[in-house]
Amino acid sequence: STNATYYIPFVSGTGYQANYIDSTNLTYNPYTNAISCNTFAGSSTSALYADLAEVYGADANYEVGTLVALGGYYEITTTTTPYQSSTIGVISGKPAHIMNAGYTADYPVIVGLTGRLPVKFIGQVRKGDLITSSELPGVACKLDPIHFVPGCIIGKSLEDKFTEIEGMVEIIVGRY
């Protein structure tokens, strides 16, 4: 049901409390006994997805997997140069947690700042290789240590890719 009032019982030690849940933010499937919620304020011990993300104002709406950097007219834009030190993350499609969720902008985008994310990628890569920005806007590539620039590394590859064509590669976003 999507238009109902729910009271969910919570038990803590010897106490019992029924809390009202706003149905505009909640769906309940009685067949699977699953509760889904768009926004949750509280404590969670696990998450279905694997990246920590934040909302930023961008120059446009970007596709999931686009590599982004500080700059442009607002706060962020796509990466535009190889080994770009202002790179901050990857556009996320299914973040585990979104910080700054109430932020408003003409083009609010969700940027994965750490964790596992798919990224647009050009060239070959092996699991564990360091990842940076390429010459293609918003597309990552394997780092060539000869061209290293401080701050240019966005993460490490979690998988192998043996083709030169552009595709998606799962990476661990983080500072290395």
Regions found by a protein language model. Give the residues of each.
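Extracellular receptor-binding modules and their adjoining Ser/Thr/Gly/Asp/Asn-rich linkers
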Residues: A4-Y6, F10-N25, T39-Y176
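Short secondary-structure subsegments characteristic of cysteine-rich extracellular domains
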Residues: T27-N29
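Beta-strand repeat architectures
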Residues: Y31-N33
